[in-house]
């Protein structure tokens, strides 16, 4: 079992490197039991990657940062993302990611759910390990 203060892994630090992007950084975070490479983030949130070793992955969308995440990471809009998951649900029997309403809720879900990964716009007060900076 893990404790609530377990370290979160930052699977990717995604910024465009310009002044505007710095005002809206995006961090992909995972539960301490998840080993995920930045290149696997897209596959995770599109249902193509379901396990990291023996750990069942649980993607968690952050409603507050979803538009930014979809544009920067998945390079699609909300309509296309929803359509993708509707098709995947019928075709493959997969459920779309859970949805958190804010950074704080996403962090809490990742801390308490083994296999969970999400994304946030701030890391204030969070003990993390940066795996990659892009």
Map each language-model feature to its residues.
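Bacterial N-terminal signal peptides that target proteins for export
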Residues: 1-10
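Sec/Tat signal peptide C-region and signal peptidase I cleavage site
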Residues: 17-23
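Flexible loop/hinge segments at secondary-structure junctions
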Residues: 23-134
């Amino acid at each position: 079992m893990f404790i609530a203060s377990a370290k979160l892994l930052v699977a990717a630090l995604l910024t465009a490197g310009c002044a505007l992007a710095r005002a809206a950084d995006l961090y992909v975070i995972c539960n301490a039991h998840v080993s995920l490479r930045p290149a696997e983030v897209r596959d995770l949130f599109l249902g193509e990657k379901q396990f990291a070793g023996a750990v069942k992955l649980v993607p968690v969308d952050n409603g507050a940062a979803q538009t930014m995440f979809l544009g920067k990471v998945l390079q699609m809009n909300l309509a296309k993302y929803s359509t993708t998951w509707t098709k995947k649900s019928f075709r493959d029997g997969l459920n779309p990611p859970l949805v958190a309403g804010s950074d704080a809720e996403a962090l809490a879900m990742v801390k308490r759910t083994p296999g969970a990964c999400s994304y946030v716009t701030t890391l204030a007060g969070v003990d993390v390990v940066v795996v990659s900076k892009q």
